[in-house]
Regions:
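Residues that mark the start of a beta-strand
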Residues: 2, 27-29, 170
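Short Gly/Pro-enriched turn/cap motifs at secondary-structure boundaries
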Residues: 7, 19-20, 53-59, 113-118, ...
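Short glycine/threonine/proline-enriched tight-turn/helix- or strand-capping micro-motif at secondary-structure
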Residues: 10-18
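Glycine-rich beta-strand-centered segment in the early N-terminal region that forms part
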Residues: 20-35, 48-97, 138-140
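Cysteine-cluster motifs in flexible loop/terminal segments that predominantly coordinate metals
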Residues: 38, 86-135, 139-142
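Cytochrome P450 core scaffold surrounding the K-helix E-X-X-R motif
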Residues: 40-46
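Mid-domain Rossmann-like dinucleotide-binding core that forms the NAD(H)/NADP(H) cofactor-binding site
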Residues: 139-189
Length: 189
């Protein structure tokens, strides 16, 4: 399959790679139907992300169709259209249990896709922790509209949220809700 790959500082290359396979019962393989380039991908290209691994396929903003799932994946099945969350997470470590999935301590957790493990600028992508990392796309939503859910909308929303009083749980007037990788803050009445 073709994959857009981070070769070295300053260099991305479109090259042939093997189609990914399941490595865990928690994985899914997704056929990518649409992906976008994020400024974070460009930061990798220009050496501003030291943890990025040369040789990985870049990309963490994508939608696609589930091709295969591991035994423990139950929320999606082959044939489902899905968004892929920017961050994969185990759901078990201290950070995941406290809502800070970007700091997941698992080797495949946090910002792994397209940084430390192969991402979605390819024909196929392996998604670790697919149970938490994939969200079904309703039939009424286009791939183009759904593409923004995994990173752009969530990042923008969180960036604009009121974090004045972080020590008391994101402000005393707000309750946090998590839906996959989409976060919502609800103002108490």
């Amino acid at each position: 399959m073709l994959a857009y790959t981070y070769e070295e500082n300053g260099k991305f290359v479109l090259k042939e790679k093997e189609k990914p396979t399941l490595q865990s019962e928690d994985d899914a393989i997704v056929r990518v139907t649409l992906a976008s380039i994020c400024s974070s991908d460009l930061h990798i290209k220009h050496g501003a992300v030291p943890r990025a691994v040369p040789g990985i396929t870049v990309g963490h903003e994508m939608v696609g169709i589930v091709e295969e799932t591991g035994r423990r994946v139950t929320k999606v099945k082959p044939g489902d259209r899905v968004t892929v969350n920017v961050e994969t997470f185990c759901g078990e470590c201290f950070f995941c249990k406290n809502g800070f999935v970007n700091n997941c301590t698992d080797q495949n957790g946090g910002w792994a896709l397209g940084c430390r493990i192969d991402g979605g600028q390819a024909e196929y992508v392996r998604v670790p922790y697919a149970e938490q990392g994939l969200n079904k796309i309703p039939d009424s939503v286009t791939d183009e509209a759904a593409l923004f859910v995994g990173d752009v909308l969530a990042t923008g929303f969180l960036g604009g949220a009121d974090f004045r009083d972080r020590r008391r749980g994101y402000g005393r007037h707000y309750r946090r809700r998590t839906y996959g990788n989409l976060y919502a803050f609800v103002r108490d009445a």
